[in-house]
From Swiss-Prot:
Name this protein carries in UniProt: 2-oxoglutarate dehydrogenase E1 component
Protein family (similarity comment): Belongs to the alpha-ketoglutarate dehydrogenase family.
Organism: Rickettsia bellii (strain RML369-C)
Keywords for the protein's UniProt record, in alphabetical order: Glycolysis, Oxidoreductase, Thiamine pyrophosphate
Purpose of the protein: E1 component of the 2-oxoglutarate dehydrogenase (OGDH) complex which catalyzes the decarboxylation of 2-oxoglutarate, the first step in the conversion of 2-oxoglutarate to succinyl-CoA and CO(2).
UniProt key word Oxidoreductase: yes
Entry GO CC: cytosol; oxoglutarate dehydrogenase complex
SUPFAM superfamilies given in the database record: Thiamin diphosphate-binding fold (THDP-binding) (SSF52518)
Length: 927
């Protein structure tokens, strides 16, 4: 044996892997290895001592013990060790050998490259007939059979990467599932698979013939992805899943809408004929066909599952966090704490998956408690191109899925032309997600039959590839040939399937000519919500109720060690409420939340540091000073109250805002808020604002009551901590699509938050929220301003009792600058200062009436802190001047504020103070 050890290089050959794995096993559970190995490993101080000459004798002794146990095994103990090493190395590296490319363009590695030849493990061809027994194997093989089994399992049409999975139970389960080979298909199932392929390809070809050149972003070449999604849904249904939400980009979407989600073919075809996707009377912009979502119920026997496909823009992968948020909201509604009743399927393209940062943001947040949805089943449709860019131009790794390993996700790569392999991989992935509640990826390597779209010419840039594609059999044809060869179908079966489906589509086409598009919205939970406001929402709450709630919010458990500074703060709040004294911003916000919670409204607030608040004002989560326990006063108001969920988010804007927007889509009765650490950082999520929040209603008939809190205000903190880019939100504002506000009083924020739930419409609310004003002595409101029969006031008149006829100058402003103007004005009674608490929609009637009140004034000024090319000026100029005309005043508003600037603010506090003083003096006419 010792001689054999020297021959095979035991210590430094394939057995090294085996010994290292055995050592890991020993570290986890010493009793799980033989006593002799226990003695050896107990003498090892670190893994570097495992494989050196001084330990050889001890290893040989342990090996001899193993040999005595398996003396009847025809293969020596040394080789038995090497069998383990070979199996492990196949598991780790054989995916590089797998035949994944249906076009045959990829040059794969060889066994010699990967050191997977039998010679690398001390075997020779003479031993191929020798019988092998090993703990990894469920049955006995000879060496040749074992090699064939490993080749078929790990180097065939499926290549797997499971080694990054950190949990050993999960990893072993995955390998066992793959190696068991139990997933097979009956003749009837094979026929159903073929039928699916016929319908996928048939619909694409039908559209291609009827509407030549029309964009549809065909799935052809990646046909298996549609069949795989259907398989995943059917498997999930039998696992007790009640709902599946699907997110995807545009490629293959029309087939997903029809074949997977169940939208009638005639509805999709009608969109090609008329160009209309919604009823004309809705008067909305709509969107292209391959961006639209849909929902339906699929019934199989006595089981039913609800399916929904999320709407999305052309911004690839942007939908990822939105659909995840929607899934989480649905799980929360069902109290699905195990995350097993509502499931997520996400379809990616290869270039976008590794190219778009939101993918990494979404993946990294998926295991976190506030964003976990029990795992996502990811399908990466790798058609080996990104528009015209080759794979080598879009990533440095072989696989587009490489960086997904940051969350230790198992990955199965599969050849898209081998439909049964695709379905086997899907089966494993679906089971894994449901069993372990974690993400899993199936990458389908396929191709794109046409160019990026059907009007694009791919031969310009990928001539070699497309010459292969042109002469290639489709996945349906390939599978039909296999079934004919195996005797499952005869030569006519495939042709009949195609004829039957073509006849069905012809009927659908005729019905599509007179098809009236339907608007599937404002049903179910959304009943009672309307697109237009019918009345002003009364948002006030009885004063005694507010005092009672406020007092309750200031009470702490006796055994809970609150920070002494917070004890003082809460005592002061309680005293103010009890004495009916004015309250500050944080108190008003907490009262808004408390009054909604006790009325049955669930509230969810996330964002960086939002539990405490960036500016240490909210303190809605109290931390015990002795241990790590927490106490949330808002969840301790009454036994019947709704839930307040608050979570400090990971350091992301794009994905976190997207998640909360998605959460808000599921239930209009929830108040959902996202707070930026500083408003300046919100533009990291600009795509969410542009493509979803501002435009989803007119594009897709999707409403949202999401609240976005953006700390804003020029306070000398530099260009990155001053501006939430108010001007950008005002530029996006149109068609009554959202509220853009810059409130200045606690009463305003109280009413704004409550209006989001009490009103009969759901519009996103953008709030330029305060920073220094959170502790400003004048930023307070009386409880009466929050009391019964009160409401949000979009415009606030001059607070002092000035004689209107004596007013010579009227200053309109919004936000923090008001308090600076107010203080500098002092006792000057000839200047009236009016605040716009809501900039959009512009409350023209209210402004006109106030201007009429001050019609004796000779000067009308719009004052802002922001540079002239920022802030509200360029949006509001025409509104203000039109209001002057309606008020019968022949004048125009003059701008006073900072000059135009490429940067939002100066970097110096001294320079800021000079600028601020200058604009205030100019506005007030102070020398």
């Amino acid at each position: 044996m010792e001689e054999n050890l020297k021959k095979t290089g035991f210590l430094f050959g394939g057995n090294a892997v085996f010994i290292e794995e055995l050592y890991k096993q020993y570290l986890e559970n010493p009793a799980s290895v033989d006593q002799t190995w226990q003695e050896f490993f107990s003498s090892v101080k670190d893994s570097n001592q495992l494989l050196n000459k001084s330990t050889a004798k001890i290893i040989l002794k342990a090996a001899a013990t193993e040999e005595s146990k398996t003396s009847e095994n025809p293969v020596s103990t040394t080789n038995n060790f090497n069998v383990g090493a070979m199996i492990k190395n196949y598991r780790k590296y054989a995916h590089y050998l797998a035949k994944l490319d249906p076009l045959g363009l990829e040059v794969t590695k060889t066994k010699e490259d990967l050191k997977l030849s039998i010679e690398n493990f001390g075997f020779t061809n003479d031993q191929l007939s020798k019988v092998i027994e090993h703990k990894f194997l469920e049955k006995t093989y000879n060496l040749g059979e074992l090699v064939n089994f490993l080749d078929k399992t790990y180097a065939g049409s499926i290549g797997v990467e499971f080694e990054q999975v950190e949990n050993e139970e999960e990893k072993n389960w995955l390998y066992s599932k793959l190696e068991s080979g139990v997933i097979s298909f009956s003749s009837e199932e094979k026929k159903n698979i073929l039928n699916d392929l016929v319908e996928v390809e048939g619909f694409e070809q039908y559209l291609h013939t009827k509407f030549p050149g029309a964009k549809r972003f065909s799935v052809e070449g990646g046909d298996a992805s549609i069949v795989a999604m259907n398989k995943a849904i059917d498997l999930s249904l039998h696992q007790g899943v009640e709902e599946i939400v699907i997110g995807m980009a545009h490629r293959g979407r029309l087939n997903t809408l029809t074949k997977v989600v169940g939208k009638p073919y005639r509805a999709v075809i009608a969109g090609f004929i008329s160009g209309s996707v919604f009823p004309d009377e809705l008067n909305v912009s709509g969107d292209v066909k391959y961006h639209l979502g849909y929902s339906s119920d699929r019934v199989v026997g006595d089981k039913k599952i609800h399916l929904s496909l999320a709407d999305n823009p052309s911004h690839l992968e942007a939908v990822n966090p939105i659909f995840a948020g929607k899934v989480r909201a649905k799980q929360d509604m069902l109290k699905d704490n195990k995350r097993s009743k509502v499931k997520a399927i996400l379809v990616h393209g290869d270039a976008a998956f590794c190219g778009q940062g939101v993918v990494a943001e979404s993946l990294s947040m998926s295991p976190l408690a506030a964003y976990n949805i029990g795992g996502v089943l990811h399908f990466v449709i790798n058609n080996q191109l990104g528009f015209t860019a080759n794979a080598a131009d879009t990533r440095a790794s072989r696989y587009s899925t490489e960086f997904a390993k940051i969350i230790a996700v198992p990955i199965l790569h599969v050849n898209g032309d081998d439909i049964e392999a695709v379905l086997k991989a899907t089966n494993i992935a679906v089971e894994y997600r449901q069993k372990f509640g974690k993400d899993v990826i199936v990458e389908i390597i396929c191709y794109r039959k046409y160019g990026h779209n059907e009007g694009d010419e791919p031969m310009y840039t990928q001539g070699k590839m497309y010459n292969i594609i042109k002469s290639k059999l489709t996945p349906g044809n390939i599978y039909a040939n296999e079934l004919v060869k195996s005797g499952v179908i005869d030569n006519n079966y495939f042709a009949k399937l195609k004829e039957q489906f073509k006849a069905k589509l012809d009927k659908e086409y005729e019905q599509a000519k007179n098809y009236k598009q339907e608007a599937h919205f404002l049903g179910g939970l959304w009943q009672g919500i309307t697109r237009t406001r019918t009345q002003v929402a009364v948002t006030g709450v009885d004063k005694k109720t507010l005092q009672s709630l406020g007092t309750k919010l200031c009470e702490m458990p006796k055994d809970f060690a609150v920070n002494p500074k917070l004890v003082k703060l809460f005592d002061a709040r309680k005293a103010a409420l009890t004495a009916d004294q004015p309250i500050d911003w944080a108190t008003a916000e907490q009262l808004a939340f408390a009054s909604l919670l006790t009325s049955g409204t669930n509230i969810r607030l996330t964002g960086q540091d939002c539990g405490r608040g960036t500016f240490s004002h909210r303190h809605s989560v109290l931390h015990n000073q002795v241990d790590d326990t927490t106490y949330i006063p808002l969840n301790n108001l009454s036994k019947e109250q709704a839930t307040y969920e608050v979570a400090d988010s990971n350091l992301s804007e794009y994905a976190v805002l997207g998640f909360e927007y998605g959460y808000s889509l599921a239930n209009p009765k929830n108040l959902v808020l996202w707070e930026a650490q500083f408003g300046d950082f919100a533009n990291g999520a600009q795509i969410i604002f542009d493509q979803f929040i501002s435009s989803s209603e007119t594009k897709w008939l999707r409403m949202s009551g999401l609240v976005v809190l953006l700390p804003h205000g020029f306070e000398g903190q530099g260009p990155e901590h001053s501006s939430a880019r108010l001007e950008r939100f005002l530029q996006l504002a149109a068609e009554d699509n959202m509220y853009v506000t810059y409130p200045t009083t606690p009463a305003s924020i109280f009413h704004l938050l409550r209006r989001q739930i009490i009103d009969n419409v759901r519009k996103p609310l953008i709030v330029m929220s305060p920073k220094s004003l959170l502790r400003h002595k004048n930023v307070v409101s009386k409880l009466d301003e929050l009391g019964s029969n009160t409401t949000f006031l979009p415009v606030l008149d001059e607070v002092n009792k000035l004689e209107a006829s004596n007013i010579t100058k009227v200053i309109l402003c919004s936000g923090k600058v008001y308090y600076d103007l107010f203080e500098m004005r002092g006792s000057n009674s000839s200047i009236a200062i009016i605040r716009l608490e809501q900039l959009y929609p512009f409350e023209k009637k209210v402004v006109v009436e106030l201007l009429k009140k001050y019609n004796k004034a000779s000067e009308f000024i719009w004052c802002q802190e922001e540079p002239m090319n920022m802030g509200a000026w360029r949006y509001i100029t025409s509104h203000l001047n039109n209001a002057l005309k309606e008020a019968g005043i022949n004048n125009e508003f003059k701008y006073i504020g900072r000059e135009e600037s490429a940067s939002p603010a100066v970097g110096s506090l001294q320079a800021h103070n000079k600028q601020q003083e200058k604009l205030l003096k100019e506005a007030l006419g102070v020398k």
